[in-house]
């Protein structure tokens, strides 16, 4: 008998969005692979420490050092680099034995570590990522096929509405303002239900066009009504049964006037 619950698919990774703001991430290496890792963690607002002699720096890493985007230690790896305040370690070097040594040291200190190109010595993987404003989508093959992950990511990315990133930004502003207006915990269900209805009713393009004026106008309907974009943006409006309907009776009103004129 088939279960009504979803089947377990073992062998996957736990894909989470880890908040790394201000956390110290140690990156051993300064080549092209390290450059990609550095960008990933800088995008997460982490404090990046690069350990690599100057001769091992690629142009991008050298530029980020020059721009003071990262902290740089101009030398090879030392055990002292694994201080107690390091939250994550990434190795991106062409020395498998040193990578393995760093991996073992990190495990002994319970520091999450990723050793590039050595899947068995990775606590986590870097997937192929899509970024559109607040939207982040990661495609991971769990180390099986990085190139395929990249191809799949491109297919997904091509299908994403260009307005998505801005729509998410504006939805976040609307959600925060609603929380500021009605912060009480007992209103959480009403807030959630109203926001769900807005997201289902409005298109991404409409959400992306929200500005402060429209947000304030929209919040005036909470919690009694979920208006459409057209209702709050059409200049002409009438009050019916204590609700504001924008432009909804213009056509019918014109027809009514025509009939009145004929009657006269």
Swiss-Prot record:
* SUPFAM superfamilies in UniProt: NAD(P)-binding Rossmann-fold domains (SSF51735), Siroheme synthase middle domains-like (SSF75615)
Q: Where does NAD(+) bind?
A: 32-33, 53-56
Q: Which molecular function GO terms apply here?
A: precorrin-2 dehydrogenase activity; sirohydrochlorin ferrochelatase activity
Kindly identify the residues recorded as the active site. 117 (proton acceptor)
Q: Which residues form a coiled coil?
A: none
Which GO terms are recorded in the biological process aspect for this UniProt protein? Answer: siroheme biosynthetic process; sulfate assimilation
* Annotated InterPro entries: Met8-like, Met8_C, NAD(P)-bd_dom_sf, Sirohaem_synthase_central, Sirohaem_synthase_N
A Pfam family: Sirohm_synth_M
Catalysed conversion reaction: precorrin-2 + NAD(+) = sirohydrochlorin + NADH + 2 H(+); siroheme + 2 H(+) = sirohydrochlorin + Fe(2+)
| Domain of life of the organism encoding this protein | Eukaryota
**What family does this belong to?**
Belongs to the precorrin-2 dehydrogenase / sirohydrochlorin ferrochelatase family. MET8 subfamily.
Q: Which NCBIfam families match?
A: cysG_Nterm (TIGR01470)
Q: What is this protein called?
A: Siroheme biosynthesis protein met8
Instruction: Quote the gene name from the UniProt entry.
Output: met8
